[in-house]
Design a protein with these regions (language model features):
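Short polybasic/polar patches that bind polyanions
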Residues: 63, 225, 321
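Active-site phosphate/pyrophosphate-binding segments
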Residues: 2-39, 134-252, 262, 324-340
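Composition- and surface-driven signal marking solvent-exposed, interaction-prone regions
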Residues: 219, 266-269, 308, 331
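A broadly tuned, weak detector of single residues within folded domains
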Residues: 1-2, 308
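Generic C-terminus detector
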Residues: 298-340
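Glycine-rich phosphate-binding loops that contact phosphosugars or nucleotide phosphates
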Residues: 35-181, 209, 244, 256-298, ...
Length: 340
């Protein structure tokens, strides 16, 4: 029997194409407002997988626009009730449901503090959307699996589209148009060597840098949620500042080495951990002592990690079932988590 997660992962290319077609006007309106506001700071508001999406957008904004990005803790508004001075800033809130009270409170507080607010959500009539000046509706359709997949991908797509239009970056816009086809190819990549290794694992590291760091964090979360596997996502630099101390013989490591300026550094870390005895797997690049996993053809350094996320989702759904789990219903979790 096909899981909801498998079906929803398979729907990602169509969902991406649907967003690009139906939400273009929403993106352009928000991008024009961003150009008019010309923010000197951008803050993000999100939790869980949505916060990983926000981390992805942090790197895209900083690398493309040169504007610093900070994640704001929703509890600053929802529990501590501290106003923030955000004049001259923009605020992007990301939430699949748009319902969590802390996210909604922070978006309201950001607007009161002077920020231009943009909501990214699958529900255009949600409280978060209503609390924001602009909304980018994902239009991804129903997502029944507790583990977010297509809404994670389309949330990043929405943000990258916004940033590309804000900066009027033709190369990135052209790459975005080709994403649905690249995502379709990613669904069929063979990561079975990694599946065989993680089928019996208890712990793992997932590494990346730049936008791929956010995908590493998301991959580690999905390994916990759907596979009952204790995994941690790290920057391929940060892992050397302490966490690598526990990497010994046969410790599994997945390194996401997309084609960007950081690739050689990710490969160098992978080789160092392999030399410590780790079982290292690297996407899209060769590393001494490591197993290379296939990657989809490169489009643009700022979208290639998103394509890698699609390949990972297809992989982790099968790994979940291989380990005897139901990927749709992780223990102790619900689809919509509302926190203060």
């Amino acid at each position: 029997m096909t899981s909801h997660m498998a079906r929803e992962v398979a729907e990602i290319p169509t969902a991406a194409a649907q967003f690009l077609k139906l939400s273009a006007g929403d993106v352009q309106a928000a991008a024009e407002a961003m150009r008019q506001a010309d923010p000197s700071l951008l803050v993000t508001v999100a939790r869980g997988s949505s916060d990983h999406a926000a981390t992805y957008l942090k790197y895209v904004v900083e690398l493309l626009a040169g504007v610093p990005v900070a994640s704001v803790g929703p509890s600053v508004a929802s529990i501590y009730r501290r106003p923030l001075r955000l004049g001259g800033a923009a605020c992007i809130g990301i939430s699949q449901s748009g319902q969590s009270p802390d996210i909604v409170e922070m978006m309201l507080a950001a607007g009161r503090g002077g920020a231009l607010t943009v909501a990214v959500t699958n529900f255009a009539d949600s409280p978060m959307a209503q609390a924001s000046a602009f909304c980018l509706p994902l239009r991804a359709g129903a997502e029944q699996s507790v583990a977010a997949t297509k809404t994670f991908v389309t949330s990043i797509l929405a943000g990258v589209c916004l940033i590309a239009h804000w900066q009027q970056d033709t190369a990135l816009l052209n790459a975005i148009d080709r994403l649905p086809d690249a995502m379709e190819k990613a669904l069929h990549l063979d990561w079975s060597p990694l599946s065989a290794r993680l089928s019996r694992a208890q712990s793992a590291y997932v590494l990346g840098r730049g936008p791929a760091f956010s995908i590493a964090a998301e991959a580690a979360l999905k390994l916990k949620e759907t596979c009952g596997l204790h995994a941690e996502g790290y920057s391929a630099a940060e892992v050397l500042h302490g966490p690598s101390a526990i990497v010994q013989a046969q410790f599994p490591v997945l390194a996401l080495a997309v084609e960007d300026a950081a690739q050689t550094h990710v490969v160098a870390t992978a080789e160092r951990l392999a030399a410590q005895g780790a079982d290292v797997f690297v996407t899209g690049a060769a590393a001494a002592g490591a197993t290379t996993l296939p990657a989809a053809p490169a489009l643009h350094p700022l979208v290639d990690p998103l394509v890698t996320a699609v390949a990972f989702y297809a992989f982790v759904e099968t790994l979940s079932r291989r380990r005897g789990y139901d990927p749709d219903t992780p223990p102790h979790l619900r689809k919509v988590t509302e926190t203060l």
